[in-house]
Amino acid sequence: MTNAATTVSVNAVGKRFRNRVALDGVDLDIGRGVTGLLGPNGAGKTTLLKIVATTLAPDAGAVRVLGWDPAHKGERRQIRRALGYLPQETGAYSDFTAFDFVDYVAILKEITDRQRRRDDVRRVLTAVGLENRMHSKIRSLSGGMRRRVVLAQAMLGSPRLLILDEPTAGLDPVERLRFRETVSAVASTETVVLSTHLTEDVAAVCTDVVVLDRGHNRFTGPPDDLAAMADGHVWETEMSDPTATLSWLTGQGRYRNLGTPPDGAELVPPSLEDGYMLLTAPDSREVRS
């Protein structure tokens, strides 16, 4: 049994697909609140979430979810009853209404009492802002609304652990804001783990962040601590300089640089994105030295 404050415990977990190492000795503990898995494509985020959600078994290491061991069939079933899962690739039957689709998933989740099940379907659809569209056909909904329908099914039964894989992918700014508000409300009482490659998602809702890069856990801690890793390494200047290790346009006609400061550059406070980019840069060890 893990510590009562720990919802998910991952110890030396490894996973390989043919000749590609997806996870290499990953260790981390996740507690209540919102934990963001941040990393580039191919970092191992989806693989790790599938292992925690019990849809994929690790090749090495051990996992505990809510105190249960998913390696044992009986405990794996307990985990699945206690979690909600929004995979990266999702779909919903377009000829179903939003209500009927979520109700169908509730039946699959063995919520057998009809009145309790239908009350819960209404609750989760209202929670994601679809109270006025719950009887609309899914094919008539916008992409953002469809994503919210699938989020609603993950929230059925008030799960103790909610796993969201790239939940804001493809959403417009308004839908992304609404999604973040919903996640924050859920996380006030339960544990949410979400994967993303967008630092703004982490900055907006996450209490902790885990940076995965090429199958390795590069950082675990509060977002402010990740930003602080770039302290003293972030500069802004009016023009780009080839001596800068990384640079990008800030949108105000100025370039932001990580690494060697060009002439006339101004040292500025680091952001979460600065810390993340510095940590995952191919030559990050040289930059931080």
Where are each of the predicted segments found?
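Conserved ABC transporter NBD signature motif
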Residues: 61-72, 78-79
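Conserved ABC ATPase "signature" region
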Residues: 103, 107-110, 115-133
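A short, proline-enriched helix->beta-strand linker immediately N-terminal to the Walker B motif
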Residues: 156-160
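Catalytic Walker B motif of ABC-type/P-loop ATPase nucleotide-binding domains
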Residues: 162-166, 171
